[in-house]
C-alpha cells in the first residue's frame, strides 16, 4: 500500500535511514522545478517501509517518465519489501501514464580508499540489492564505465568526519594549503552576499573548461531552498595588502643582501638574491592584477554546499585560473569540508569522479584522501511494457548525444 505523505513525514523517514542524502530531501524538487514531483510513502499495514521523492517528466502524447534520484529509501536486503515497493511504484506509474521509472539507489558496490580500490571485493549489501531489484522486476543498466552514461555519477569521492584531517593528507596537499595561507589567501563563509562573486567564478570555470553550467539565478535558488542548510566558501586575496607586505619583504631582503656582500658571504648573497627575484616576480604579477581587476580584494575560488540530515554535498565549485599559483582551490575545498564537519555532518560528498579513476575530477579530489564510492547504478522499472523498450532506447540515444 502506498499514499502521498507530507514533507515532514518523508524527511523524517529519510533522515532516520542509513541512506540519507540531499537528492531525496523533500526540498530537492523545488530546485528541479521543470519537473513535477510527488512524495510517496509505502506501508505494510500502519508501518512505513519505504519512502520516495519522485520527479515526474512530461513526455509527448501525455506520457511521462519518473525518476527517483538516490532512492527509493528502503531495506534492499528484504526481498519482500523490495517486491512490494516496486509493485506499488508500477501502480503509481500507471496513474501517471509513465513509460518507465528510473532509480539509482544510494547503495554501494565499493567503499574504499583509492589505493585499495582495484583489489577490494564488492560489498555484499550492493550485490544483494542488485539481485533483489532484478528479481522484483527492475532492469539493471549494469556497471557503466563512463561518467556521462548515468544521470547521477556512479562513482564519487566522499570525505568522512572520522577520517578527515590535515595530518591524513599527503605532504604535497599540506604544502599547497600552507602556500595558500602564506600568500595571504583569506577564507570566508557566507550566503547571498557572496553570490555575485561566486557566479563570476563559475563563469570563469565555464569559459576555461568550455562547458555550460548554471547562472546566478540558479545558485540563488539553491540558497533560497535550503536557507539554513547551505553556505558558500570563498577564498579571496587582498591584492593591495599582499603587495604592500611583499614590497617590504623585498626591501628587507635587499638590505640583507648588501650586508652579506660586505661580509663576503657568497652563499647568503645568492639566497637573498633568489628571495629578491621571487618577490619581484610576485610584485610584478600583483601590479598587473591590480590593473586587470580594478579592485583590491579579488575572489580566487569558491564552493557552494548544501546539507540534509547529517550529510553535506559540495554542489558547485569555481576558480580563477589567473591566480592558480596561490593554490586557492585546494585550500577552499579543505575549509569547505572542515566547515561541514564543524556543523555536525558525518560526511561531505565532493561529487562525481571518472569511473576509471582517472582524469581531472579524480586527480583533484584524490588530493584529499577521500573514500571512493561506487554505487550499484541505475535501474529501470518498466510500466508500459509495450512502449518501454522503444522509449528506453530513445532515452539512451538522447543521453549519449547530450553527454
PLM feature segments, named:
Residues 83, 90-96, 131-132, 146-150, ...:
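Short, charge-rich binding segments
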Residues 79-90, 325-337:
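Conserved acetyl-CoA-binding loop-helix of GNAT-fold acetyltransferases
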Residues 93-115, 341-352:
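Conserved GNAT acetyl-CoA-binding A-motif
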Residues 220-223, 303, 337, 362, ...:
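Generic hydrophobic alpha-helical scaffold/packing signal
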Amino acid at each position: 500500500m502506498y499514499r502521498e505523505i507530507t514533507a515532514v513525514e518523508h524527511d523524517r523517514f529519510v533522515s532516520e535511514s542509513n541512506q540519507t542524502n540531499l537528492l531525496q530531501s523533500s526540498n530537492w524538487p523545488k530546485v528541479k522545478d521543470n519537473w513535477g514531483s510527488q512524495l510517496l510513502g509505502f506501508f505494510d499495514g500502519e508501518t512505513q517501509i519505504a519512502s520516495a521523492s519522485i520527479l515526474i517528466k512530461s513526455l509527448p502524447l501525455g506520457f511521462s517518465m519518473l525518476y527517483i534520484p538516490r532512492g527509493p529509501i528502503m531495506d534492499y536486503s528484504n526481498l519482500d519489501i523490495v517486491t512490494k515497493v516496486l509493485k506499488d511504484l508500477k501502480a503509481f506509474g500507471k496513474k501517471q501514464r509513465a513509460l518507465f521509472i528510473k532509480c539509482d539507489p544510494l547503495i554501494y558496490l565499493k567503499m574504499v580508499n583509492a589505493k585499495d580500490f582495484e583489489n577490494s571485493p564488492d560489498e555484499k549489501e550492493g550485490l544483494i540489492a542488485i539481485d533483489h531489484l532484478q528479481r522484483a522486476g527492475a532492469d539493471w543498466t549494469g556497471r557503466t564505465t563512463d561518467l556521462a552514461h548515468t544521470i547521477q555519477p556512479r562513482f564519487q569521492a566522499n570525505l568522512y568526519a572520522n577520517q578527515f584531517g590535515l595530518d591524513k593528507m599527503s605532504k604535497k596537499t599540506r604544502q599547497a594549503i600552507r602556500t595558500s595561507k602564506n600568500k595571504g589567501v583569506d577564507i570566508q563563509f557566507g550566503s547571498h552576499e557572496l553570490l555575485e562573486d561566486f557566479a563570476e567564478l563559475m563563469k570563469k570555470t565555464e569559459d576555461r573548461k568550455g562547458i555550460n553550467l548554471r547562472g546566478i539565478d540558479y545558485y540563488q535558488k539553491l540558497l533560497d531552498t535550503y536557507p539554513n542548510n547551505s553556505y558558500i566558501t570563498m577564498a579571496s586575496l587582498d591584492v593591495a595588502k599582499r603587495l604592500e607586505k611583499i614590497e617590504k619583504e623585498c626591501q628587507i631582503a635587499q638590505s640583507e643582501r648588501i650586508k652579506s656582500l660586505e661580509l663576503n658571504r657568497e652563499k647568503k648573497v645568492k639566497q637573498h638574491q633568489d628571495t629578491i627575484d621571487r618577490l619581484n616576480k610576485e610584485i610584478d604579477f600583483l601590479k598587473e592584477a591590480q590593473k586587470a581587476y580594478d579592485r583590491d580584494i579579488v575572489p580566487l575560488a569558491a564552493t557552494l554546499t548544501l546539507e540534509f540530515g547529517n550529510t553535506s554535498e559540495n554542489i558547485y565549485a569555481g576558480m580563477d585560473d589567473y591566480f592558480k599559483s596561490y593554490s586557492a582551490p585546494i585550500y577552499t575545498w579543505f575549509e569547505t569540508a572542515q566547515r561541514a564537519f564543524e556543523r555536525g555532518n558525518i560526511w561531505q560528498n565532493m561529487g562525481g569522479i571518472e569511473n576509471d579513476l582517472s582524469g581531472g575530477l579524480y586527480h583533484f579530489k584524490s588530493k584529499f584522501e577521500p573514500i571512493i564510492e561506487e554505487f550499484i547504478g541505475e535501474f529501470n522499472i518498466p510500466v508500459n511494457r509495450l512502449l518501454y523498450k522503444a522509449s528506453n532506447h530513445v532515452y539512451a540515444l538522447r543521453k549519449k548525444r547530450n553527454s
